[in-house]
Amino acid sequence: QVDVDAGQPAVNAVVNSHALTGKVMCGYQGWFTCSEDGGELGWTHWARAIHRPFGPGNAAVDLWPDMQEFSQDERYPTDFKHADGRPAAVYSSANKKTISRHFRWMRDYGIDGIFLQRFANELHSARLKAQKDVVLFHVRDAALETGRVFAVMYDLSGLRKGQVASAGNDWKQLMHDGVTKGSRYLHHNGKPLVAVWGVGFSDDRDYTLAECGDLIDVLKSEGCAVMLGVPSWWREQERDAVSDKSLHDVLKKADVLSPWTIGRYRSLHEASLHARRVWKPDLDLSLIHI
Protein backbone atom coordinates (compact mmCIF):
# COMPACT_ATOMS: atom_id res chain seq x y z
CA GLN A 1 0.00 0.00 0.00
CA VAL A 2 1.30 3.43 -0.96
CA ASP A 3 -0.01 6.64 0.57
CA VAL A 4 -0.32 9.49 -1.90
CA ASP A 5 1.05 12.84 -0.79
CA ALA A 6 -1.27 15.82 -1.05
CA GLY A 7 -1.46 17.10 -4.59
CA GLN A 8 0.32 14.14 -6.19
CA PRO A 9 -1.23 11.97 -8.94
CA ALA A 10 -3.19 9.01 -7.63
CA VAL A 11 -2.67 6.71 -10.61
CA ASN A 12 -2.11 3.09 -9.52
CA ALA A 13 -1.65 4.10 -5.87
CA VAL A 14 -3.87 3.85 -2.82
CA VAL A 15 -5.16 7.30 -1.90
CA ASN A 16 -4.84 8.11 1.79
CA SER A 17 -8.22 8.63 3.40
CA HIS A 18 -7.02 10.80 6.27
CA ALA A 19 -7.73 14.28 4.87
CA LEU A 20 -9.53 16.12 2.09
CA THR A 21 -6.55 18.43 1.58
CA GLY A 22 -4.85 18.17 -1.81
CA LYS A 23 -7.29 15.73 -3.37
CA VAL A 24 -9.10 15.84 -6.70
CA MET A 25 -12.69 14.95 -5.81
CA CYS A 26 -15.79 14.70 -8.00
CA GLY A 27 -19.50 14.62 -7.40
CA TYR A 28 -21.04 11.23 -8.22
CA GLN A 29 -24.81 11.14 -8.54
CA GLY A 30 -25.39 7.46 -9.14
CA TRP A 31 -28.96 8.19 -10.21
CA PHE A 32 -29.33 6.45 -13.58
CA THR A 33 -31.66 3.46 -13.68
CA CYS A 34 -32.90 1.22 -16.50
CA SER A 35 -36.16 -0.65 -16.83
CA GLU A 36 -34.45 -4.07 -16.75
CA ASP A 37 -31.96 -3.48 -13.92
CA GLY A 38 -34.22 -4.99 -11.26
CA GLY A 39 -34.96 -1.80 -9.36
CA GLU A 40 -38.39 -1.14 -10.88
CA LEU A 41 -37.60 2.57 -11.26
CA GLY A 42 -37.84 2.70 -15.03
CA TRP A 43 -35.48 4.93 -16.98
CA THR A 44 -34.76 7.42 -14.20
CA HIS A 45 -32.73 10.42 -15.42
CA TRP A 46 -32.47 8.93 -18.91
CA ALA A 47 -36.09 9.55 -19.94
CA ARG A 48 -38.54 12.33 -19.17
CA ALA A 49 -41.37 9.84 -18.68
CA ILE A 50 -39.41 7.17 -16.82
CA HIS A 51 -41.96 4.36 -17.17
CA ARG A 52 -42.31 4.80 -20.93
CA PRO A 53 -39.75 3.39 -23.39
CA PHE A 54 -36.54 5.42 -23.54
CA GLY A 55 -36.47 6.44 -27.17
CA PRO A 56 -36.97 9.32 -29.61
CA GLY A 57 -39.21 11.98 -28.08
CA ASN A 58 -38.65 10.75 -24.53
CA ALA A 59 -35.12 11.72 -23.54
CA ALA A 60 -33.85 13.69 -20.53
CA VAL A 61 -30.15 13.71 -21.46
CA ASP A 62 -28.14 15.96 -23.75
CA LEU A 63 -25.26 13.56 -24.38
CA TRP A 64 -24.93 9.81 -24.89
CA PRO A 65 -22.41 7.83 -22.81
CA ASP A 66 -19.50 6.17 -24.59
CA MET A 67 -20.33 2.50 -24.07
CA GLN A 68 -17.36 0.99 -25.93
CA GLU A 69 -15.67 -0.41 -22.81
CA PHE A 70 -18.83 -1.77 -21.18
CA SER A 71 -19.42 -5.51 -21.15
CA GLN A 72 -22.66 -7.03 -22.42
CA ASP A 73 -24.16 -7.45 -18.94
CA GLU A 74 -23.74 -3.71 -18.33
CA ARG A 75 -25.61 -2.67 -21.47
CA TYR A 76 -29.35 -1.92 -21.33
CA PRO A 77 -30.91 -1.59 -24.81
CA THR A 78 -33.12 1.38 -25.55
CA ASP A 79 -35.51 2.33 -28.35
CA PHE A 80 -32.82 4.51 -29.92
CA LYS A 81 -31.04 2.95 -32.90
CA HIS A 82 -27.52 3.12 -34.31
CA ALA A 83 -27.14 3.93 -37.99
CA ASP A 84 -26.88 0.21 -38.75
CA GLY A 85 -30.15 -0.53 -36.94
CA ARG A 86 -28.69 -1.95 -33.73
CA PRO A 87 -30.38 -0.76 -30.51
CA ALA A 88 -28.32 1.82 -28.63
CA ALA A 89 -27.56 0.89 -25.02
CA VAL A 90 -26.95 2.82 -21.81
CA TYR A 91 -25.80 1.85 -18.31
CA SER A 92 -27.45 1.62 -14.89
CA SER A 93 -26.03 2.93 -11.62
CA ALA A 94 -27.55 -0.13 -9.96
CA ASN A 95 -25.06 -2.38 -11.75
CA LYS A 96 -22.14 -3.13 -9.43
CA LYS A 97 -19.87 -3.87 -12.38
CA THR A 98 -20.49 -0.43 -13.86
CA ILE A 99 -19.69 1.44 -10.65
CA SER A 100 -16.49 -0.59 -10.36
CA ARG A 101 -15.67 0.45 -13.93
CA HIS A 102 -16.20 4.13 -13.12
CA PHE A 103 -13.86 3.82 -10.15
CA ARG A 104 -11.20 2.11 -12.25
CA TRP A 105 -11.40 5.05 -14.64
CA MET A 106 -10.91 7.39 -11.69
CA ARG A 107 -7.83 5.43 -10.66
CA ASP A 108 -6.46 5.39 -14.20
CA TYR A 109 -6.95 9.12 -14.75
CA GLY A 110 -5.82 10.51 -11.40
CA ILE A 111 -9.14 11.24 -9.66
CA ASP A 112 -8.80 10.58 -5.94
CA GLY A 113 -12.42 9.98 -5.06
CA ILE A 114 -16.02 11.11 -5.00
CA PHE A 115 -18.74 12.70 -2.96
CA LEU A 116 -21.72 10.39 -3.43
CA GLN A 117 -24.86 12.48 -3.81
CA ARG A 118 -27.69 11.43 -1.51
CA PHE A 119 -30.77 13.46 -2.36
CA ALA A 120 -32.58 14.06 0.91
CA ASN A 121 -35.97 14.79 -0.69
CA GLU A 122 -36.16 11.14 -1.83
CA LEU A 123 -35.32 9.45 1.46
CA HIS A 124 -39.00 9.22 2.44
CA SER A 125 -39.61 6.69 -0.37
CA ALA A 126 -38.57 3.16 0.59
CA ARG A 127 -37.99 2.25 -3.06
CA LEU A 128 -35.84 5.31 -3.82
CA LYS A 129 -33.90 4.95 -0.58
CA ALA A 130 -33.23 1.29 -1.37
CA GLN A 131 -31.75 2.30 -4.73
CA LYS A 132 -29.51 4.85 -3.03
CA ASP A 133 -28.36 2.25 -0.52
CA VAL A 134 -27.48 -0.19 -3.32
CA VAL A 135 -25.38 2.47 -5.04
CA LEU A 136 -23.71 3.39 -1.75
CA PHE A 137 -22.70 -0.22 -1.07
CA HIS A 138 -21.39 -0.59 -4.63
CA VAL A 139 -19.40 2.64 -4.24
CA ARG A 140 -17.91 1.42 -0.96
CA ASP A 141 -16.79 -1.84 -2.57
CA ALA A 142 -15.44 -0.12 -5.69
CA ALA A 143 -13.43 2.37 -3.62
CA LEU A 144 -11.85 -0.51 -1.72
CA GLU A 145 -11.12 -2.36 -4.94
CA THR A 146 -9.42 0.62 -6.61
CA GLY A 147 -7.85 2.48 -3.70
CA ARG A 148 -10.10 5.52 -4.11
CA VAL A 149 -11.93 7.40 -1.34
CA PHE A 150 -15.57 8.41 -0.97
CA ALA A 151 -17.80 10.45 1.30
CA VAL A 152 -21.55 10.99 1.49
CA MET A 153 -23.00 14.32 0.36
CA TYR A 154 -26.59 15.20 1.24
CA ASP A 155 -28.27 17.44 -1.33
CA LEU A 156 -31.06 19.38 0.37
CA SER A 157 -32.64 20.60 -2.89
CA GLY A 158 -36.40 20.10 -2.97
CA LEU A 159 -36.91 19.76 0.77
CA ARG A 160 -39.82 21.60 2.36
CA LYS A 161 -39.70 23.51 5.61
CA GLY A 162 -39.28 21.12 8.52
CA GLN A 163 -37.78 18.28 6.45
CA VAL A 164 -34.03 18.92 6.79
CA ALA A 165 -33.85 16.76 9.91
CA SER A 166 -34.51 13.70 7.72
CA ALA A 167 -30.92 13.93 6.48
CA GLY A 168 -29.61 13.76 10.03
CA ASN A 169 -31.77 10.75 10.82
CA ASP A 170 -30.56 9.01 7.68
CA TRP A 171 -26.94 9.71 8.56
CA LYS A 172 -27.37 8.23 12.02
CA GLN A 173 -28.62 5.04 10.38
CA LEU A 174 -25.69 4.96 7.97
CA MET A 175 -23.30 5.43 10.87
CA HIS A 176 -25.02 2.57 12.68
CA ASP A 177 -24.61 0.45 9.54
CA GLY A 178 -20.87 1.16 9.57
CA VAL A 179 -20.56 3.17 6.37
CA THR A 180 -17.65 5.21 7.77
CA LYS A 181 -15.75 2.31 9.30
CA GLY A 182 -14.10 1.04 6.15
CA SER A 183 -10.61 2.18 5.17
CA ARG A 184 -11.86 4.04 2.09
CA TYR A 185 -14.27 6.44 3.76
CA LEU A 186 -12.78 9.94 3.60
CA HIS A 187 -11.86 11.61 6.89
CA HIS A 188 -10.79 15.16 7.66
CA ASN A 189 -9.14 16.40 10.84
CA GLY A 190 -9.40 12.88 12.21
CA LYS A 191 -13.16 12.63 11.68
CA PRO A 192 -15.40 11.09 8.99
CA LEU A 193 -16.33 13.81 6.51
CA VAL A 194 -19.96 14.29 5.52
CA ALA A 195 -21.09 17.01 3.11
CA VAL A 196 -24.34 18.98 2.98
CA TRP A 197 -25.13 20.82 -0.25
CA GLY A 198 -27.58 23.70 -0.53
CA VAL A 199 -27.00 26.02 2.43
CA GLY A 200 -27.65 29.75 2.03
CA PHE A 201 -28.84 29.95 -1.57
CA SER A 202 -31.20 32.73 -2.66
CA ASP A 203 -33.34 30.59 -4.98
CA ASP A 204 -36.43 30.49 -2.74
CA ARG A 205 -35.66 27.26 -0.90
CA ASP A 206 -38.40 26.44 1.57
CA TYR A 207 -36.21 25.08 4.36
CA THR A 208 -34.50 27.49 6.75
CA LEU A 209 -30.98 28.38 7.80
CA ALA A 210 -31.93 27.42 11.35
CA GLU A 211 -32.73 23.90 10.14
CA CYS A 212 -29.36 23.74 8.38
CA GLY A 213 -27.62 24.82 11.56
CA ASP A 214 -29.42 22.13 13.52
CA LEU A 215 -28.40 19.51 10.95
CA ILE A 216 -24.75 20.53 11.26
CA ASP A 217 -25.04 20.20 15.04
CA VAL A 218 -26.45 16.68 14.65
CA LEU A 219 -23.66 15.63 12.29
CA LYS A 220 -21.06 17.11 14.64
CA SER A 221 -22.60 15.28 17.58
CA GLU A 222 -22.03 12.05 15.65
CA GLY A 223 -18.31 12.84 15.58
CA CYS A 224 -18.12 14.05 11.97
CA ALA A 225 -16.36 16.82 10.12
CA VAL A 226 -18.83 18.76 7.94
CA MET A 227 -18.42 20.27 4.49
CA LEU A 228 -21.07 22.68 3.20
CA GLY A 229 -21.99 23.37 -0.42
CA VAL A 230 -22.63 27.12 -0.43
CA PRO A 231 -23.29 29.95 -2.92
CA SER A 232 -20.42 31.71 -4.70
CA TRP A 233 -21.16 34.98 -2.92
CA TRP A 234 -21.72 33.59 0.57
CA ARG A 235 -19.23 36.05 2.08
CA GLU A 236 -20.92 39.15 0.65
CA GLN A 237 -24.45 37.68 0.97
CA GLU A 238 -25.54 38.87 -2.45
CA ARG A 239 -26.46 37.52 -5.91
CA ASP A 240 -26.81 33.74 -5.41
CA ALA A 241 -26.66 33.98 -1.61
CA VAL A 242 -29.37 34.97 0.85
CA SER A 243 -28.98 38.25 2.67
CA ASP A 244 -29.42 36.99 6.21
CA LYS A 245 -27.34 37.94 9.24
CA SER A 246 -27.52 34.37 10.51
CA LEU A 247 -25.84 32.88 7.40
CA HIS A 248 -22.27 33.39 8.60
CA ASP A 249 -23.12 32.00 12.03
CA VAL A 250 -24.34 28.80 10.36
CA LEU A 251 -21.31 28.57 8.07
CA LYS A 252 -18.90 28.99 11.00
CA LYS A 253 -20.15 25.65 12.31
CA ALA A 254 -18.64 23.85 9.30
CA ASP A 255 -15.12 22.52 8.79
CA VAL A 256 -15.03 23.03 5.01
CA LEU A 257 -16.88 25.36 2.62
CA SER A 258 -17.35 24.45 -1.05
CA PRO A 259 -18.71 27.38 -3.09
CA TRP A 260 -20.88 26.56 -6.11
CA THR A 261 -19.21 28.17 -9.13
CA ILE A 262 -21.00 26.54 -12.07
CA GLY A 263 -21.63 29.26 -14.67
CA ARG A 264 -19.68 31.88 -12.74
CA TYR A 265 -16.89 32.06 -15.35
CA ARG A 266 -16.53 30.95 -18.97
CA SER A 267 -12.81 31.20 -19.67
CA LEU A 268 -9.45 30.87 -17.94
CA HIS A 269 -9.25 34.66 -17.78
CA GLU A 270 -12.64 34.91 -16.07
CA ALA A 271 -11.65 32.09 -13.71
CA SER A 272 -8.52 34.01 -12.73
CA LEU A 273 -10.57 37.12 -12.07
CA HIS A 274 -13.02 35.13 -9.97
CA ALA A 275 -10.17 33.61 -7.97
CA ARG A 276 -8.67 37.03 -7.26
CA ARG A 277 -11.90 38.92 -6.58
CA VAL A 278 -13.92 36.22 -4.82
CA TRP A 279 -11.89 33.21 -3.66
CA LYS A 280 -8.95 35.17 -2.21
CA PRO A 281 -11.16 37.32 0.08
CA ASP A 282 -13.19 34.19 0.90
CA LEU A 283 -10.01 32.43 1.99
CA ASP A 284 -8.81 35.40 4.02
CA LEU A 285 -12.09 35.47 5.95
CA SER A 286 -12.10 31.71 6.42
CA LEU A 287 -8.56 31.68 7.82
CA ILE A 288 -9.65 34.04 10.58
CA HIS A 289 -12.09 31.42 11.85
CA ILE A 290 -9.86 28.33 11.79
Residue positions per predicted region:
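Mature N-terminal, pre-catalytic/accessory segment of carbohydrate-active enzymes
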Residues: 1-23
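N-terminal carbohydrate-binding/catalytic regions of secreted carbohydrate-active enzymes
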Residues: 23, 27-129, 133, 138
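Alpha-helical scaffolding within the catalytic cores
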Residues: 9-13, 94-102, 132-139, 169-182, ...
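Long, well-ordered mid-to-C-terminal structural blocks that present hydrophobic/aromatic surfaces
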Residues: 248-286
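A generic structural signal for well-ordered alpha-helical segments
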Residues: 106, 143, 219, 283-284
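Active-site region of glycoside hydrolase catalytic domains
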Residues: 36, 144-262
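Conserved small/polar residues in nucleotide/adenosyl-binding loops
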Residues: 288-290
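The substrate-binding groove and active-site-proximal loops of carbohydrate-active enzymes
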Residues: 81-95, 115-130, 152-165, 192-206, ...
